[in-house]
């Protein structure tokens, strides 16, 4: 080491390392004295005047840093690059290293002269700036180049204390640019190369660093020798000082200032030489080092006072460049020697090293013993020959320096760049190598043009450096010795780069004032060396970059003198132990440097539009530059501070963002998993923290769970119940399939993950983790695996419990549920999240009575300050508030409160309160209960888009309190408040918690309801239950999931009990003739007594009956299509025998149900299910016939029925008020219902035809289809009471005959009933008889059947029964209503008829519209919870039936049987709307259903008008 350093120094000055250090110290002292600057100025000025064009760019950089440094850099680089600073800068940047060596040699004489000239030229301004404008001049300069920083810092010292900091900064920045932008950039790049090399030196070994230092010394000897001599002569320093500068320049690889001065020229050239002739220049530089070292000593001598000031500067800069300044100046000189042999540039560096020696140990070490060591240190700090400030900046700028590397890549100022710079600064030698690799096209360009010029300059500089070196050898030897001692102290203080840097920073801070003075004194010499270094760095980085660096460095030096000095002082204290910290701190400076480098790199790319050249004059005008620099420097200082903080951050750049992101979204998990699998080290750490924190997100496989079964289906996958194999804990796995995701991970899943990870509340579902179904990320990617969101398991959801009929919630339970629900919602809203999908199936309940809000797939962040549109197609229709229905897009959290209000009503009524299948129908239902939206109650409603297009048919007054009188007063107040039409008047979740109903509720202290512990009641289970009942309790459909909507449409297969209930619409249509017939027949509305008699005679008389004959006997008008279908159907004798009675009763039932428009297929279906397919065919035929018969009857009976309904609706409505779930036994319930209902209805409807209302336990789950929506149902309980089905029976002219027939049928059906019960679980006769009362209770709730409307049939079905009533004959409608009720809930037929007059037709029409094939609704769609109370279900006739008119709604009982369309339709409107159903009466709407009508199919939707809703 010493020998190498000696060689470097000795090469320059023939002095021992200690002597050189002494010389450098002496020089620094001299620099400290203000006398030298005047000398330098006269010398530099004339020469600078010669290369003024090139100097301006350098000056621009130099002036901010230090005018003298800029001048030196300008002189050094301008002599070479004067013609084209920008281009040269690019070239230099490209050819940082090799040109460095070459340029150093070339610079030797010529470069030295030019450097001196530039120094002279720049010195005056540095002095001008330096005297008072050091901040501007000095500030700009240091930013530019690390190598130049030493010389520039010297210049800055010459400039003055303030300018010293600035000059130190500018020295790095401007010094490098001093010769020209190109030269400065080249110098910067060289400095970067040197910096990088020092890093590599660190990485490699002290040997490498020694070699590189030697090379740097050699190169710097040549380069900085000439440059330093030139710079000194330019600066007006004595020949000895010049010689010393040259020596120190050669030793400036260890010493910072000469590096910057001579390094400006020689470092730029040396960098090019390094890049181009790295090895050659090494050998050559090994030869040259003596002169270079000799010259650097002069530079050091000249810079000696500068080095001190520079050290101060560098120290002050050390936080940014300061660390590197002290270490870098020393290290830079060493690194330059070792790397570039930018030691010539390091000639200035040697003074820096001397100054740095003030962070002395590092500097002296680096210089004398550890050129290699220092190169390692230089890796951290002295990458550039110039002092740390310039070298560090360059370093950071240089691709090899932390900043440089970064700059080579991105040159971002981010802490990440500083992080990168850390690693690079760690290995400066490697940096220098990487520097070569990092040579960018711009660098190459600099190499080509700038390298040549630099080589020429190097020669001139070498000559000058040789001259100056000889003269300055003596002085520089002393200065070098001093600098070496100081550097050794600094390096010792900060053995690691960081330590050196920090020590240097602290020392530089302390010495910065001195350095500023020295820079003022030494400003002239330092610019020459600084110019060399800067020119190298200028090569490395364009002048613009240099200018930015200078600006940043100036301010940063000033600010960071304090900051970095502070940091460096503690660092110096901790230096060796803190080497890691030092690394981070150097990284911080390098980070600042990187950012500067990045700017410089950007500038390099932007060299053509070099703003710096124009600014070079500004640099000459140090004040303007200073202002710019100060601003930039302040920014960079701030950035540096931030960078320091960032550098201190433990996480890699990706972690902060990736951590949360990867953690929260499964996507990121997937990425993390994939990455971790692919790159476990990278991904593991990146996402590992997250995964570890979040239970190894994505690392766990779904195999960790035992999947027990499917419990639900979401928008993007199934939900499974599973057990954790490790803990035994029950969990819910929500599957997220990526198979069909063209856009990648489903946005709903992303939203849910992101939001749920931000929500932690006892009333909000907890997402535990995310797992995949692939253990290997590659397999996952190949096979498009699935993600599983792991949630805590909840035993039930509210919908499943309400539909199951297994649970009764009392007021306390409802209070507890609502309290928990509103607490969770209030938490969401306070977190500014809108749930936007609150419904019963998304409210989960465990066996402990805890409520949790789930399914945040539609949730989104809500900004109350920002009014921006959101989609209004959110929230399930039944729970959608009126503002969304009217097109509001700037909604508020009030939308969720409305949904909760609907749930509150549903908890009391056991059914959805607003069940429509279309938005217009939903708004109509809301208007009937809550009043029509109007400006009087809702002033802003007129602003809504659909206010004029979605107006209800009529204006309704608000009668919510009247409709829900049965609700406790406190609950009713809250209910009324939550269902305010005007969202601004609606209560908030927080206000709801303060209301009387919920104020004092403590759910934890309230006993949970008696929940079915043996059965988990989920929506999917409930739907399956409905289907099973529809399928005749077969398990075939158990696996099939029917959406709640479909169920509500009339998928209530529990009534149909025929597997056909599940058939697709097309099949259902075709089969309705044969297979569906039994269903239709079962629930078929009662025919006229004469018709029934005829049918009975026909069926009994013939062993087999052709349906065509059957139609003829019944005098039914059939269209040709239906006739053909009937011809194909023959009723087997067996069917007649077994199903004869069933058919007969079913026929009357069909007739009544058809007239009612309700669907009562379940009764017939039950018997038929047991019977053969032939029976089904017979029933389908009967359904068709009966539909047509009923159509005719309905037209006649409509009026009578309407009248009777009006008459009878009065008494039956109260009966219907009965609690819906109560019918425990079909018999008893029937009796009660019969008593409540007119016994006429019972008489009218044969007992066999009447479905029994089974106890909730025995009843099949309510089909999704709500019971026929009767007016009772719509009216909820009140109106249900008002709409008795008996009136329709009274109206029926053939009421007596029908009653007799019904009795006969009932007698026959009792036998069939068991079959029906088997299929439907409802004894038709018994259940049906009580249907009137149940209809009040269940009918109302069921007819409102929430699920029907979800399909869209619900509301229409409700309307349909009303219309059907009016449309269909009263008696028919009554029976239909009764029967439909039976089918839907097996309620007494009479009740249904009461509603069905008006409603039946509407139901039929509604069903037709909803179901393309026919208006019939599926009872399976009905909610079972409502099924019990539902009265008669109106049977919708097949829309297919051409003859199907409004009256024909009941003619297709078969189809209706399958799906209980009537019942579903009635329920769909919702209880309240059905209650209003009387108003809905539009008899014309109820169309007859053709045989082909399929209840399952939403044929009603196809019908278009058959909704049965008045609107």
Curated annotation (Swiss-Prot):
Residues 160-171, 246-269, 384-402, 463-490 have a biased composition (Low complexity). The keyword Phosphoprotein applies. Residues 49-58, 1253-1269 have a biased composition (Pro residues). GO terms for biological process: alternative mRNA splicing, via spliceosome; hemopoiesis; negative regulation of stem cell differentiation; positive regulation of transcription by RNA polymerase II; positive regulation of transcription elongation by RNA polymerase II; regulation of signal transduction. ATP binds at residues 711-719, 734. Residues 705-998 form the Protein kinase domain. It comes from the Eukaryota. The modification Phosphoserine is found at residues 316, 318, 326, 341, 343, 359, 361, 384, 396, 398, 401, 438, 440, 526, 1048. Its EC number is 2.7.11.22, 2.7.11.23. Keywords: Acetylation, ATP-binding, Isopeptide bond, Kinase, mRNA processing, mRNA splicing, Nucleotide-binding, Nucleus, Phosphoprotein, Serine/threonine-protein kinase, Transferase, Ubl conjugation. The modification N6-acetyllysine is found at residue 557. It catalyses: [DNA-directed RNA polymerase] + ATP = phospho-[DNA-directed RNA polymerase] + ADP + H(+); L-seryl-[protein] + ATP = O-phospho-L-seryl-[protein] + ADP + H(+); L-threonyl-[protein] + ATP = O-phospho-L-threonyl-[protein] + ADP + H(+). Residues 491-511, 1144-1166 have a biased composition (Polar residues). The active site is at residue 837. Interacts with C1QBP. Interacts with CCNK, CCNL1 and CCNL2. PANTHER family: CELL DIVISION PROTEIN KINASE, CYCLIN-DEPENDENT KINASE 13. This is Cyclin-dependent kinase 13. It comes from Mus musculus (Mouse). The gene is Cdk13.
């Amino acid at each position: 080491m010493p020998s190498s350093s000696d060689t470097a120094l000795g090469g320059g000055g023939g002095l021992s390392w200690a002597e050189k250090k002494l010389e450098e110290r002496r020089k620094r002292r001299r620099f400290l004295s203000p006398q030298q600057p005047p000398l330098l100025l006269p010398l530099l000025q004339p020469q600078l005047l010669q290369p003024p064009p090139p100097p301006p760019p350098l000056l621009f950089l130099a002036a901010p840093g230090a005018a003298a440094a800029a001048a030196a850099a300008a002189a050094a680089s301008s002599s070479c690059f004067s013609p084209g600073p920008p281009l040269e800068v690019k070239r230099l940047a490209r050819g940082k290293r090799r040109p460095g060596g070459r340029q150093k040699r070339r610079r030797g004489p010529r470069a030295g002269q030019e450097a001196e000239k530039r120094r002279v030229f720049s010195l005056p301004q540095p002095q001008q700036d330096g005297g008072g404008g050091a901040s501007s001049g000095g500030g700009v300069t240091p930013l530019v180049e690390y190598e130049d920083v030493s010389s520039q810092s010297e210049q800055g010292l010459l400039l003055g204390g303030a300018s010293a900091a600035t000059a130190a900064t500018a020295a790095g920045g401007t010094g490098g640019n001093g010769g020209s932008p190109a030269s400065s950039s080249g110098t910067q790049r060289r400095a970067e190369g040197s910096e990088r090399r020092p890093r590599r030196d660190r990485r490699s070994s002290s040997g490498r660093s020694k070699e590189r230092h030697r090379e740097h010394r050699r190169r710097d000897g040549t380069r900085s020798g000439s440059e330093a001599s030139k710079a000194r002569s330019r600066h007006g320093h004595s020949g000895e000082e010049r010689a010393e500068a040259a020596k120190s320049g050669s030793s400036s690889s260890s010493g910072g200032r000469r590096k910057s001065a001579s390094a400006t020229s020689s470092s730029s050239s040396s960098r090019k030489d390094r890049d181009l002739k790295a090895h050659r220049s090494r050998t050559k530089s090994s030869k040259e080092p003596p002169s270079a070292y000799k010259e650097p000593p002069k530079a050091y001598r000249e810079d000696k006072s500068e080095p001190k000031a520079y050290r101060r500067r560098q120290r002050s800069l050390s936080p940014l460049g300061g660390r590197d300044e002290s270490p870098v100046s020393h290290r830079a000189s060493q690194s330059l020697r070792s790397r570039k042999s930018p030691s010539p540039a390091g000639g200035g560096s040697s003074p820096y090293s001397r100054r740095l020696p003030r962070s002395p140990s590092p500097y002296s070490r680096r210089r004398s013993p550890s050129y290699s060591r220092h190169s390692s240190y230089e890796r951290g700090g002295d990458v550039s020959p110039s002092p740390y400030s310039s070298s560090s900046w360059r370093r950071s700028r240089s691709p090899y320096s932390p900043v440089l590397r970064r700059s080579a890549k991105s040159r971002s100022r981010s802490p990440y760049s500083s992080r990168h710079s850390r690693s690079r600064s760690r290995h400066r030698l490697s940096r220098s190598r990487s520097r070569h690799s990092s040579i960018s096209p711009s660098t190459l360009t600099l190499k080509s043009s700038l390298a040549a010029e630099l080589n020429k300059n190097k020669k001139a500089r070498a000559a000058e450096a040789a001259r100056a070196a000889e003269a300055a050898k003596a002085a520089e030897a002393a200065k070098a010795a001093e600098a070496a001692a100081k550097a050794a102290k600094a390096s010792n203080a900060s053995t690691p780069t960081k330590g050196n840097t920090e020590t240097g920073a602290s020392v530089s801070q302390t010495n910065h004032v001195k350095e500023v003075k020295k820079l003022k004194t030494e400003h002239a010499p330092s610019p020459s060396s600084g110019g060399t270094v800067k020119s190298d760095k200028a090569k490395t980085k364009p002048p613009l970059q240099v200018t930015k660096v200078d600006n940043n460095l100036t301010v940063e030096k000033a600010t960071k003198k304090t900051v970095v000095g502070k940091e460096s002082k503690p660092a110096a204290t901790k230096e060796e132990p803190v080497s890691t910290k030092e690394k981070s701190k150097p990284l911080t400076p390098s980070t600042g440097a990187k950012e500067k480098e990045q700017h410089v790199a950007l500038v390099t790319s932007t060299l053509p539009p070099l703003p710096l050249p124009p600014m070079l004059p500004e640099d000459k005008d140090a004040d303007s530059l200073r202002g710019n620099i100060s601003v930039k420097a302040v920014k960079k200082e701030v950035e540096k501070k931030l960078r320091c903080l960032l550098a201190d951050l433990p996480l890699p750049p990706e972690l902060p963002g990736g951590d949360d992101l990867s953690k929260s979204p499964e996507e990121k998990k997937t990425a993390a998993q994939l990455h971790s699998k692919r790159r476990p080290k990278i991904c593991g750490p990146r996402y590992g923290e997250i995964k570890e924190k979040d239970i190894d997100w994505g690392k766990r496989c779904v195999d960790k769970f035992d999947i027990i079964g499917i419990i639900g289906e979401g928008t993007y996958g199934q939900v499974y119940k599973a057990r954790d194999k490790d803990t035994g804990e029950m969990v819910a796995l929500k599957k997220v399939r990526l198979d069909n995701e063209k856009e990648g991970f489903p946005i709903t899943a992303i939203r849910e993950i992101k939001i749920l990870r931000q929500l932690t509340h006892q009333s909000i579902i907890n997402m535990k983790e995310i797992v995949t179904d692939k253990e290997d990320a590659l397999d996952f990617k190949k096979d498009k695996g699935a993600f599983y969101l792991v949630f805590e398991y909840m035993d039930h959801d509210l919908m499943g419990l309400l539909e199951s009929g297994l649970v009764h919630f009392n007021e306390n339970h409802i209070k507890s549920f609502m309290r928990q629900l509103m607490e969770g919602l209030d938490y969401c809203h306070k977190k500014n999240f809108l749930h936007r999908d609150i419904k019963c199936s998304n409210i989960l309940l465990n066996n402990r009575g805890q409520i949790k809000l789930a399914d945040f797939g539609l949730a989104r962040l809500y900004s109350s300050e920002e009014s921006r549109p959101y989609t209004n197609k959110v929230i399930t229709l039944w729970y959608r508030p009126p503002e969304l229905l009217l097109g509001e897009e700037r909604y508020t959290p009030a939308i969720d409160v409305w949904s909760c209000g609907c749930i509150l009503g549903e908890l009391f009524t056991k059914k959805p309160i607003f069940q429509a299948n279309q938005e217009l129908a939903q708004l109509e239902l809301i208007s009937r209960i809550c009043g029509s939206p109007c400006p009087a109650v809702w002033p802003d409603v007129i602003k809504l888009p659909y206010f004029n297009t979605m107006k209800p048919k009529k204006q309704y007054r608000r009668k919510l309190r009247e409709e829900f009188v049965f609700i406790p007063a406190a609950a009713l107040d809250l209910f009324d408040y939550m269902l305010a039409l005007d969202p601004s008047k609606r209560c908030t979740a927080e206000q709801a918690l303060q209301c009387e109903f919920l104020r004092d509720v403590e759910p934890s202290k309230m006993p949970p309801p008696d929940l079915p512990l043996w059965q988990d009641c989920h929506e999917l289970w409930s739907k399956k239950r409905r289907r099973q009942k529809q399928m005749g309790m077969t398990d075939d459909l158990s696996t099939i999931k029917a959406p709640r909507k479909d169920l509500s449409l009339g998928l209530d297969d529990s009534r149909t009990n025929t597997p056909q209930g599940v058939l697709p619409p097309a099949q259902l249509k075709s089969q309705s003739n044969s297979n569906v017939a039994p269903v239709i027949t079962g629930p078929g509305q009662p025919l006229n007594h004469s018709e029934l008699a005829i049918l009975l005679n026909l069926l009994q008389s013939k062993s087999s009956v052709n349906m065509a004959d059957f139609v003829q006997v019944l005098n039914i008008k059939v269209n040709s299509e239906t006739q053909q279908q009937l011809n194909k159907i023959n009723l087997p004798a067996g069917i007649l025998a077994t199903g004869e009675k069933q058919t007969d009763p079913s026929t009357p039932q069909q007739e009544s149900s058809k007239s009612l428009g309700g669907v009562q297929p379940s009764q017939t279906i039950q018997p038929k299910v047991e019977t053969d397919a032939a029976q089904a065919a017979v029933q389908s035929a009967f359904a068709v016939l009966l539909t047509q018969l009923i159509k005719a009857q309905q037209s006649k009976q409509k009026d009578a029925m309407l009248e009777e309904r009006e008459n009878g609706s009065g008494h039956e409505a109260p009966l219907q008020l009965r609690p819906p779930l109560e019918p425990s036994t079909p018999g008893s319930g029937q009796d009660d219902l019969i008593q409540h209902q007119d016994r006429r209805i019972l008489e009218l409807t044969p007992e066999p035809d009447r479905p029994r209302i089974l106890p909730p336990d025995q009843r099949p789950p309510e089909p999704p289809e709500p019971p026929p929506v009767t007016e009772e149902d719509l009216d909820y309980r009140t109106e249900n009471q008002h709409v008795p089905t008996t009136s329709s029976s009274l109206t029926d002219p053939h009421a007596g005959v029908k009653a007799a027939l019904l009795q006969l049928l009932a007698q026959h059906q009792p036998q069939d009933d068991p079959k029906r019960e088997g299929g439907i679980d409802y004894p038709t006769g018994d259940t049906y008889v009580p249907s009137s009362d149940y209809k009040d209770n269940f009918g109302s709730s069921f007819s409102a059947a929430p699920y029907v409307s979800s399909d869209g049939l619900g509301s229409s079905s409700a309307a349909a029964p009303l219309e059907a009533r009016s449309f269909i004959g009263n008696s028919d409608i009554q029976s239909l209503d009764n029967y439909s009720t039976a089918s839907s809930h097996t309620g007494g037929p009479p009740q249904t008829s009461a509603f069905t007059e008006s409603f039946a037709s509407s139901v039929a029409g509604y069903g037709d519209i909803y179901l393309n094939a026919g208006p019939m609704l599926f009872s399976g769609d009905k909610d079972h919870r409502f099924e019990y109370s539902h009265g008669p279900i109106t049977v919708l006739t097949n829309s297919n039936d051409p003859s199907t008119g409004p009256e024909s709604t009941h003619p297709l009982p078969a189809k209706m049987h399958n799906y209980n369309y009537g019942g579903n339709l009635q329920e769909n409107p919702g209880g309240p709307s059905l209650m209003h159903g009387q108003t809905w009466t539009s008899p014309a709407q109820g169309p007859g259903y053709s045989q082909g009508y399929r209840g399952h199919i939403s044929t009603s939707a196809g019908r278009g008008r058959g909704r049965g809703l008045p609107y």
